[in-house]
UniProtKB/Swiss-Prot annotation:
A motif ('KMSKS' region) lies at residues 635-639. Keywords: Aminoacyl-tRNA synthetase, ATP-binding, Cytoplasm, Ligase, Nucleotide-binding, Protein biosynthesis. Signal peptide: none annotated. This is Leucine--tRNA ligase.
Length: 863
């Protein structure tokens, strides 16, 4: 009887749904330990799941199923991050309402997830576009507003005419929108902004106690970008204003020979002289078409002289002011003092525009390059302060004290982190709970009037103006002042997609609560999330924003923990199948891949899998072994035609095969290429398990009711130990390898004893739950194995009875001996000496030392 995976998987998915097998009780138990395991919930795109999605979902499902068997009260929910620009763009492209497309996409995602057998508690399903959900998103915004953490500001922002919305910096690449590639320009616009900078230090400090990938923590540290330095004031020549500059190297002030402003700097227009205005204006127009990322990354730094001058406060020197796009208004003050002798960027700029370079720190050859290291200061003194002879840190401290005393500057901590631009001029997002009175004052909507619901529109395209589509709905926009009853207007911007995903993990705890965001008792029981799994692309934005909101809620007494996610894991990317490429020269001859360089004039030739073979760590042409081919796996994409739909895999091989294969591909965190051949091997493995328990001819049980022998028990208990430890370490691929070893051993036995089969099925169940449930039932159990106890291993049974040990004489292995695992040292040494090849090389009179490492090695050292 073949393994009937379609019938089995359908049967058990129906069983789990009908019995609500994985529903987590609403009430908090008195004495059961919790475990909250969470996936980063998906944006339900129109294309549905691809095979990359199930990787992380399978990993969390394994942990959830394992923890239930250990007696934990497990929370394992799923929901939908459905607001935002992608959903609206898809709706516009298909000419259907976003609500309709979102509902359709969610139904497709949910069907696919259920088909893969994930043990989600679907009773807790949430959707960020549900008014019952975004009521509380709006409520959180009001907490931010009341605490002064949400404010309006005229901000230079990326405006995309085609999309009709403002985009965040990270959504613009080289002056074009990330989605669609539409041109963008920087314009000032009224925006809601969240003061995340107020939490910068706490966001940094909180990283220390988190079990997160170090690379992710470092990305957040760099994004926050804390630095210590000084703000220095440079008086403008011929004007009453002063330029304020932030620098981390105030000790080099005596070496400042020019200044540079960002194109957006508020004083640029005042500083620019008539003679230079045309050049400055044109330069700024060009600069504002570039993204901040491109402005910083471009190798050739450009600029234009403004005609203005500023006074260096330490020596009274008048130095020229330039404008350059490598200076960002978003960092520091948007102005820098340039010290070309000791800054590489300033050095290149000074050489290009023939500006002075003045050494103030000894240690390098500034004619050749900037010296950025430590050293004694020179040429750094005025009548009141001298830095000469001081090294960098001493000089920084001395000049900062002087600046403070003279009121020419002040000690400052600065952050690269910017306040969070929180407005979108789109339709498909959470409305702001804010109204504006006739005199322009903004006021919060009373909490009892939440949610402010998103109106249904027949036409929801962007208006092409900063106001957004909601501004066109007069009967929705027009409202009253909640305090006076006078006419007022609603805020017509909407919140960004990040809003709903900042706090969803809390709503899963108490999804049906109409009175509060989350019940305090439930929150204290479940938080923080014990295991959070999702892609590394969210390392900064989502994870940083969620941490910020959580800390605000902590300060408000809504949550009991300072951090939301205790342990974070990023699953690796599943790449397309390996593609092979050979190269031919002009004569048509093959050129081996290791000889190919960028300058070679060669023709790439795709090679079929069957025409290559592996030779060590490389691939070669099967009929020309001397010719290496290029073997690469690429990210799955429609353009490459290498996207694999999980529905197709499940149709052909079953959900358990897909789950098991994705975990067996390699370590969870690594990128891995898809291999249909390897997946077929995993499917054969599941068939072998089926045949171990089920008779191939009769369809009855193939297990034996006889007592297992000691070797069978040892094999089982070693497998229990390995699988248990590997799940704890999230080494799922090696756990599967251990089960494969068990099956290989069991296939050599006359029959699989029931006492061995039963615990093995439990080991299998987190990985291949459908097959495990079926085998469990056939073994005579009338209840689901979902909450059956995880098997324990017996230390006595896994201890090796006999060990093999190498025996060395003067460091050279001369023999291998077998001894009892618990043998006394004297007995081991005696056995080692009796080994024929050891005795031949050993003279007792010359024996100097006997080295014995229990269970590992014996070494005799002679004179």
């Amino acid at each position: 009887m073949a393994y009937p995976f379609h019938d089995i998987e359908t049967k058990w998915q129906q069983y789990w749904e009908e019995h609500q097998t994985f529903r987590t009780p609403d009430e908090v138990p008195d004495d059961q330990e919790e475990f909250y395991v969470l996936d980063m919930f998906p944006y339900p795109s129109g294309s549905g799941l691809h095979v990359g999605h199930p990787e992380g979902y399978t990993a969390t499902d394994i942990v959830a199923r394992y923890k239930r068997k250990q007696g934990f009260n497990v929370l394992h929910p799923m929901g939908w991050d459905a607001f935002g620009l992608p959903a609206e763009q898809y709706a516009l492209k298909t000419n259907t309402h976003p609500r309709e497309t979102t509902e359709k996409n969610i139904a497709q995602f949910k069907r696919q997830l259920k088909r893969l057998g994930f043990s989600y508690d679907w009773q807790r399903e949430i959707n960020t576009t549900d008014p019952d959900y975004y009521k509380w998103t709006q409520w959180i915004f009001l907490q931010l507003y009341e605490k002064g953490l949400a404010y309006q500001s005229e901000e230079p922002v990326w405006w995309c005419e085609e999309l009709g919305t403002v985009l965040a910096n990270e959504e613009v690449i080289d002056g074009k929108s990330e989605r669609g590639g539409y041109p963008c320009e920087r314009v000032p616009m009224r925006q809601w902004v969240l003061k995340i900078t107020e939490y910068a230090d706490r966001l940094l400090e909180g990283l220390e106690d988190l079990d997160w990938p170090e690379s992710t923590k470092e990305m957040q540290r760099n994004w926050i970008g804390r630095s210590e330095g000084a703000n220095v004031y440079f008086d403008l020549v011929g004007a009453d204003d002063a330029l304020e500059v932030y620098t981390t190297r105030p000790d080099t002030l005596f070496g400042a020979t020019y200044m540079v402003l960002a194109p957006e700097h508020e004083l640029l227009d005042e500083i620019t002289t008539d003679e230079h205005r045309e050049d400055v204006d044109e330069y700024c127009r060009q600069a504002l078409r570039k993204s901040e990322r491109k402005r910083q990354q471009q190798g050739d730094k450009t600029g234009v002289f403004t005609g203005g001058y500023a006074v260096n406060p330490v020596n009274g020197e008048e130095i020229p002011i330039w404008v350059a796009d490598y200076v960002l208004v978003s960092y520091g003050t948007g102005a820098i003092m340039a010290v070309p002798a000791h800054d590489e960027r300033d050095h290149a700029f000074a050489n290009k525009y023939d500006l002075p370079i003045r050494e103030v720190v000894e240690g390098g050859d500034i004619d050749e390059e900037a010296y950025t290291g430590d050293g004694p200061h020179v040429h750094s003194a005025n009548e009141a302060v001298s830095l000469n002879g001081l090294r960098n840190e001493e000089a920084k401290e001395a000049i900062t004290e002087w600046l403070d005393e003279e009121e020419k500057g002040e000690r400052t901590v600065n952050y690269q982190l910017q306040d969070w631009l929180f407005s979108r001029q789109r339709y498909w997002g959470e409305p702001f709970p804010i109204v504006f009175t006739e005199d322009g004052e903004d006021k919060p909507v009373p909490e009892e009037e939440l949610p402010v619901t998103l109106p249904d529109l027949d036409v929801f395209e962007p208006s092409g103006t900063p106001e957004g589509p909601l501004a066109t709905i007069e009967d929705w926009r027009e409202t009253t002042d909640p305090e006076t009853g006078e006419p007022a207007q609603r805020e017509t911007n909407t919140m960004p997609q990040w809003a709903g995903s900042c706090w969803y993990y809390l709503r899963f705890i108490d999804p049906d609560n109409d009175e509060q965001l989350v019940d305090p008792e439930k929150e204290e029981y479940w938080m923080p999330v014990d295991l959070y799994v999702g892609g590394s692309e969210h390392a900064v934005l989502h994870l940083l924003y969620a941490r910020f909101w959580h800390k605000v809620l902590y300060d408000a007494g809504v949550v009991s923990t300072k951090e939301p996610f205790q342990t974070l894991v990023h699953q690796g990317m599943i790449l397309g199948e390996t593609e092979y490429t050979a190269y031919r020269d002009d004569a048509g001859e093959f050129v081996s891949a290791e000889q190919v360089d960028d300058d070679a004039d060669l023709t790439p030739v795709p090679v079929d899998d069957g025409d290559v073979k592996k030779d060590g760590d490389v691939f070669v042409l099967a009929d020309r072994p001397a010719v290496r081919v290029d073997a690469r796996s690429h990210k799955m994409s429609k353009s490459r035609g290498n996207v694999i739909n999980p529905d197709d895999v499940v149709d052909e091989y079953g959900a358990d095969t897909l789950r098991l294969y994705e975990m067996f591909m390699g370590p969870l965190e690594q990128d891995k290429p898809w291999s249909t051949d390897d997946m077929e091997g995993v499917h054969r493995f599941l068939n072998r398990i089926w045949r171990l328990v089920v008779d191939a001819d009769s369809g009855g049980l193939a297990v034996s009711d006889e007592e297992p022998d000691r070797e069978q028990l040892r094999t089982l208990h070693r497998t229990i130990k390995t699988v248990t430890e590997d799940i704890e370490a999230r080494d799922f691929n090696t756990a599967i390898a251990a089960m494969m070893e068990f099956v290989n051993a069991a296939n050599k036995w006359d029959a699989l004893p029931r006492q061995v089969a039963t615990p093995f099925v439990l080991l299998l169940s987190p990985f291949a739950p459908h097959l495990a449930e079926e085998l469990w039932a056939r073994l005579g159990h009338d209840q689901s194995l979902a909450y059956a106890d995880w098997p324990a291993y017996d230390d006595e049974l896994i201890r090796r009875e006999v060990v093999e040990m190498p025996v060395q004489v003067d460091g050279t292995v001369r023999a291998t001996i077998e001894v009892a695992a618990d043998a006394e040292e004297a007995d081991v040494l005696a056995t080692a000496k009796e080994a024929e090849n050891v005795a031949r090389h050993l003279d007792d009179e010359d024996l100097q030392r006997e080295i014995y490492v229990p269970g590992q090695i014996v070494n005799f050292v002679t004179g």
